[in-house]
């Protein structure tokens, strides 16, 4: 790829693509090839100021636009996304690395979020009680809150932005998006299509960059709320700094999801689900299976099945239809993953499938093959830390109660899954596990646009989760009106 093939990205402010107030840029790589595909500006707080000002000006008219009219724009946007499904999926694969099959699934999730947001006339409805007392009635009305800031991660460049700005905008707010500097290309395409659907200028703005943009949004007085998805340390920082400046904040953070396999489980089905959950998207998702707690009686059988299935996975450039496991996002993330693998060995875990030996790991791109450890304990870093890579740790347990207790010792509590044929075990799991997203005989309890999504403990900072009715509550404020008619 020559320099002329590299896309030079701009910011999207007030309906215009404009240069940032800086000459500093960062390279965007195709992680499957290691080649530079774009340069993204490292924008400044001046760029944030311009975007917020544009959003504030647009809010004056957009917030007064009738809700059904806003919904019609969302419906047009949804159809454009459907029409561009394959194109969007290819962009996801190019800048993120996940397989084209998974990318198409991510596009579907994003479209579902827009579909949900298009139901704004219903979502924005208030409530009324006509007879709170003699001659008195009371009602609740919803209103937008103003300019919203969104900070999104690299691992879902389509789905996460689409669960933020379409719903916020449908509720009458305006939006400033800071996409991950590692995957900014898809965000630009989303903005182009929204404009094509008829979105007025300034309602959606994009400011590319890193720390300065994040801090600019967190500190700006006219930004009323921040939605964030990313790592635990940054989520905590965003929450504390945002609330310090008087903002609503929802910050979805890291994870270390446990899958529990009981002796009565269908091991073949469990194996298939765990493989997909652990190694799909190269393990770079907050719902990835990171730890398997398996009852001792079936541990050897399950482990052999996991290794056999892992050996059959096709590793490579995700644009090829037959590929299951693509690269991790960057060279430094690959090196970090290799350090965790070495740490597991040094701390005494049994490395039973070494992804470092897959030939793709030693070629072009940022590949790490499926890696499986046995005899892991909760004292090891590979059990404690979010690795965010195709590394699976197996712990042998004697009972469901022990497995639940083990999972609950993690500081993370995003998700957990149980494989069993027992209704009583399912109930025990549901009532005692400390996590926000639970799966029963499935590997990934994925977020749905119409239900709230997030975790517990250090996996979430805030009060209102993403998606569903929580999302509507987050992006709106309420008025209570009590009236006596004379």
From Swiss-Prot:
Pathway: Polyol metabolism; myo-inositol degradation into acetyl-CoA; acetyl-CoA from myo-inositol: step 7/7
Coiled-coil zones: none
Enzyme class: oxidoreductase
Pfam entry (one): Aldedh
SUPFAM superfamilies: ALDH-like (SSF53720)
PROSITE patterns from the UniProt entry: ALDEHYDE_DEHYDR_CYS
Keyword Oxidoreductase in record: yes
Protein's UniProt keywords contain Ribosomal protein: no
Gene Ontology BP term (one): inositol catabolic process
Catalytic residues as annotated in Swiss-Prot or TrEMBL: 286
E.C. code: 1.2.1.27
Residues that coordinate or bind NAD(+): 154, 178, 181-182, 231, 386
Catalytic reactions of this protein: 3-oxopropanoate + NAD(+) + CoA + H2O = hydrogencarbonate + acetyl-CoA + NADH + H(+); 2-methyl-3-oxopropanoate + NAD(+) + CoA + H2O = propanoyl-CoA + hydrogencarbonate + NADH + H(+)
Single GO term (MF): malonate-semialdehyde dehydrogenase (acetylating) activity
Taxonomy, superkingdom: Bacteria
Role this protein plays: Catalyzes the oxidation of malonate semialdehyde (MSA) and methylmalonate semialdehyde (MMSA) into acetyl-CoA and propanoyl-CoA, respectively. Is involved in a myo-inositol catabolic pathway. Bicarbonate, and not CO2, is the end-product of the enzymatic reaction.
Name of the protein described by the UniProt record: Malonate-semialdehyde dehydrogenase
């Amino acid at each position: 790829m020559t320099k002329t093939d590299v896309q030079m990205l701009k910011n999207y402010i007030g309906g215009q693509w404009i240069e940032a107030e800086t000459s500093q840029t960062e390279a965007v790589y195709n992680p499957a090839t290691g080649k530079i595909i774009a340069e993204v500006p490292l924008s400044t707080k001046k760029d944030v100021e311009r975007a917020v000002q544009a959003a504030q000006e647009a809010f004056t008219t957009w917030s007064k636009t009738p809700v059904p009219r806003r919904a019609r724009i969302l419906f047009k946007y949804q159809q454009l996304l459907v029409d561009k499904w394959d194109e969007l999926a290819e962009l996801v694969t190019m800048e993120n690395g996940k397989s084209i099959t998974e990318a198409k699934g991510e596009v579907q999730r994003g479209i579902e979020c827009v579909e949900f947001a298009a139901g704004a006339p219903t979502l924005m409805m208030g409530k009324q009680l006509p007879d709170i007392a003699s001659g008195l009635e009371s009602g609740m009305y919803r209103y937008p809150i103003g300019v919203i800031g969104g900070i999104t991660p690299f691992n879902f460049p389509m789905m996460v932005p689409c669960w933020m700005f379409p719903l916020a905008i449908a509720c009458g707010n305006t939006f400033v998006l800071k996409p991950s500097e590692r995957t900014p290309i898809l965000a630009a395409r989303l903005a182009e299509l929204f404009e094509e659907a008829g979105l007025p200028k300034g309602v959606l703005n994009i400011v590319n960059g890193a720390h300065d943009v994040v801090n600019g949004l967190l500190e700006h007085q006219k930004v009323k709320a921040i939605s964030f998805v990313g790592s635990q340390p940054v989520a905590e920082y965003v929450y504390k700094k945002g609330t310090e400046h008087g903002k609503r904040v929802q910050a979805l953070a890291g994870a270390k999801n446990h899958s529990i396999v009981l002796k009565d489980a269908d091991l073949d089905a469990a194996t298939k689900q765990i493989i997909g959950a652990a190694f799909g998207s190269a393990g770079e998702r907050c719902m990835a299976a990171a730890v398997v707690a398996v009852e001792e009686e079936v541990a050897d059988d399950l482990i052999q099945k996991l290794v056999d299935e892992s050996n059959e996975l096709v590793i490579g450039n995700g644009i090829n239809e037959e590929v299951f496991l693509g690269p991790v996002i960057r060279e430094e993330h690959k090196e970090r993953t290799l350090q965790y693998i070495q740490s597991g060995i040094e701390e005494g875990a049994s490395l039973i499938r070494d992804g470092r030996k897959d030939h793709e790991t030693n070629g072009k791109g940022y590949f790490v093959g499926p890696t499986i450890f046995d005899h892991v304990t909760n004292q090891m870093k590979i059990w404690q830390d979010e690795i965010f890579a195709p590394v699976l740790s197996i712990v042998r347990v004697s009972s469901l109660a022990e497995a639940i207790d083990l999972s609950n010792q993690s500081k993370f509590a995003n998700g957990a899954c149980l494989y069993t044929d027992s209704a009583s075990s399912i109930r025990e799991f549901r009532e005692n596990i400390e996590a926000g997203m639970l799966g029963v005989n499935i590997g990934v309890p994925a977020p749905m646009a119409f239900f709230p999504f997030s975790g517990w403990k250090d996996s979430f900072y805030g009060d209102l989760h993403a998606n569903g009715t929580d999302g509507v509550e987050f992006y709106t404020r309420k008025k209570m009106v009590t009236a006596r008619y004379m």
